[in-house]
Amino acid sequence: MQSARMTPSVGRQLLRLGARSSRSTTVLQGQPRPISAQRLYAREATQAVLDKPETLSSDASTREKPARAESKSFAVGMFKGQLTIDQVFPYPSVLSEEQAQFLKELVGPVARFFEEVNDPAKNDALEKVEDDTLQGLKELGAFGLQVPSELGGLGLSNTQYARLAEIVGMHDLGVSVTLGAHQSIGFKGILLYGTKAQREKYLPRVASGQALAAFCLTEPSSGSDVASIRSSAIPSPCGKYYTLNGSKIWISNGGLADIFTVFAKTPIKDAATGAVKEKITAFVVERSFGGVTHGLPEKKMGIKASNTSEVYFDGVKVPSENVLGEVGDGFKVAVNILNNGRFGMAATLAGTMKSLIAKAVDHATNRTQFGDKIHNFGVIQEKLARMAILQYVTESMAYMLSANMDQGFKDFQIEAAISKIFCSEAAWKVADECIQIMGGMGFMKEPGVERVLRDIRIFRIFEGANDILRLFVALQGCMDKGKELTGLGNALKNPFGNVGLLMGEAGKQLRRRTGIGSGLSLSGIVHPELSRSGELAVQALDQFATVVEAKLVKHKKGIVNEQFLLQRLADGAIDLYAMVVVLSRASRSLSEGYPTAQHEKMLCDSWCIEAATRIRENMASLQSSPQHQELFRNFRSISKAMVENGGLVTGNPLGI
């Protein structure tokens, strides 16, 4: 596991990029190796903006500036104590009649293919996807789901894509990773940044499956710290090509791909100073260029059917026209590629959970113990109910995000990170409980649950390790709140010119701190039958925002070092966003009279009751509990002693 530390320069790069993509095109969940750009968001990712500018004069604070569009992100708003509902209410429905019909025509054949042709157990045993399966997927168009139709793809929207990702996730995560590594990250850069010539040259080949693609970022010396990449691409004196040298590790499809998105350092001369600096540039590299080789497939715990290997570049001549994006903009390209595929994992794992729950229910329905079917026992009932709730939340997040992207919203990076954290942890819990319900049978190889458990484990690591993504969620949210606090500080320099702003903020804080509440409400937004859960969500938002502000005021820019605190703020944010998402979906079901509406109401209410309790207790302890501060100090001291001792400090109680 990589360290959460990052250099200040990388943190500032992320701030300049805004940690978001300006494009909303996303494809099937793509699984990079166990590192990701999201790991880059740790530690100092918000330091620059949480610093109040020292040189800002009172005149400057009131100077007219170009208006910045107010974010419509619910997640951004909740850190500020705002109820921003544009992206979450009502639950979005974005497919046109034509898109819905096309999707229906795809769902049947894809589902039948995975039921009748693909053999996940055999793929796992062979440690490769069978050739017949790959050929069948090519014929289905599965290698170019979001490539424009005029370039040989299916041209699917994000929501259409999510539905197919769910089907793949129900059946075989090894195949899912193979497809995702190809199109979600492998050639995604060409979709996002490719020139007309690059798109016309490469997209038809990758869409047909004639050529597989891979994403080459990670190196032995660079995990979280992309700036430490050693691969180099030196321009030729004539300027017609670059000579690429270096190696990449843990590359999905590395041994199969013919087209690679590769990141390497290039020397760039500063026009102003004449100094030469190394900056990362992205390239489209073909195996046919020569000098591209790969190692043996890695032996892995799970997703064995997917190919993972090292890739080597030895004196590869890359034409200058194969630069992806601008020279020196490789960091931006990498971040945006990775940020654009996050929702698909939620859709995929929603499907995985659906299949696991079906196995658990089947076993509970038919298994008799102590003279009764085990589904009649309270312990089993609670397990099944919790599994269903986790799947419902995950599925609701997946289709909320895909719809937001299809609607053209740009600000969803916190929500996307939340969905990745939630779905990967929920899927692990569901798989674990499925085995528990099935007992010894679940531990056996034949039912296939043990394979799914092995496959699921990686999802908490790649696409951004969840520990690091939690820091990103908290820091990104605090960054936006920090900007607001800086604005209030500037307003105080000219109080008579900002009376309305200051009075409004003072009133809001007073209401929160006296327990009256902010006056926010979801009344008239959520369905009346969900009004109690809506009130719980608003109360939770008030409690959460109060703590965020208090901790920012206390720690200021130093909050980037308070990882114990940040993790718990992130947990609150995850719970709160999940509450709002299921409130939105269940409200739609009740309003439109869906047959499952009352069942969805129970799922929603159950989640909201427990999530609100967690938020209330966690925020209260962060706000005033000396025991928590003692706990954090103990964690530091225990860990330090273990590192100094090379392991456990305590000995065996027998003393032998």
UniProtKB/Swiss-Prot annotation:
Please give one Gene Ontology molecular function term for this protein: acyl-CoA dehydrogenase activity
UniProt xrefs under PANTHER family: ACYL-COA DEHYDROGENASE, VERY LONG-CHAIN SPECIFIC ACYL-COA DEHYDROGENASE, MITOCHONDRIAL
Q: How does it sit in the membrane?
A: Peripheral membrane protein
Catalysed reaction equations from the record: a very-long-chain 2,3-saturated fatty acyl-CoA + oxidized [electron-transfer flavoprotein] + H(+) = a very-long-chain (2E)-enoyl-CoA + reduced [electron-transfer flavoprotein]; dodecanoyl-CoA + oxidized [electron-transfer flavoprotein] + H(+) = (2E)-dodecenoyl-CoA + reduced [electron-transfer flavoprotein]; tetradecanoyl-CoA + oxidized [electron-transfer flavoprotein] + H(+) = (2E)-tetradecenoyl-CoA + reduced [electron-transfer flavoprotein]; oxidized [electron-transfer flavoprotein] + hexadecanoyl-CoA + H(+) = (2E)-hexadecenoyl-CoA + reduced [electron-transfer flavoprotein]
What's any GO biological process attached to this entry?
regulation of cholesterol metabolic process
Q: Which cofactor does it need?
A: FAD
InterPro entries, A to Z: ACAD9/ACADV-like_C, Acyl-CoA_DH_CS, Acyl-CoA_Oxase/DH_mid-dom, Acyl-CoA_Oxase/DH_mid-dom_sf, AcylCo_DH-like_C, AcylCo_DH/oxidase_C, AcylCoA_DH/ox_N, AcylCoA_DH/ox_N_sf
The Swiss-Prot or TrEMBL record describes its family as follows:
Belongs to the acyl-CoA dehydrogenase family.
Ranges where the record places region Disordered:
1-33
Q: What class of enzyme is it?
A: oxidoreductase
Assembly and oligomerization = Homodimer. Homodimerizes after import into the mitochondrion.
Q: Name one Pfam family in it.
A: Acyl-CoA_dh_N
Task: Please list the residues that carry the modification S-nitrosocysteine.
Answer: C238
Q: What is the protein name stated in its UniProt record? A: Very long-chain specific acyl-CoA dehydrogenase, mitochondrial
**GO CC terms:** mitochondrial inner membrane; mitochondrial nucleoid; mitochondrion; nucleolus; nucleoplasm
Its PTM note reads: S-nitrosylation at Cys-238 in liver improves catalytic efficiency.
Q: Where is this region: Catalytic?
A: 42-483
Active site per the UniProt annotation: E463
Which terms are listed as keywords in the entry? Acetylation, FAD, Fatty acid metabolism, Flavoprotein, Lipid metabolism, Membrane, Mitochondrion, Mitochondrion inner membrane, Oxidoreductase, Phosphoprotein, S-nitrosylation, Transit peptide
- What residues does FAD bind to? 215-224, 250-252, 465-467, 563
List every position bearing N6-succinyllysine: K72, K128, K196, K240, K269, K277, K279, K332, K373, K483, K557, K640
Q: Which residues carry this modification: Phosphoserine?
A: S518, S523
Pathway the protein acts in: Lipid metabolism; mitochondrial fatty acid beta-oxidation
Q: Give the enzyme's EC designation.
A: 1.3.8.9
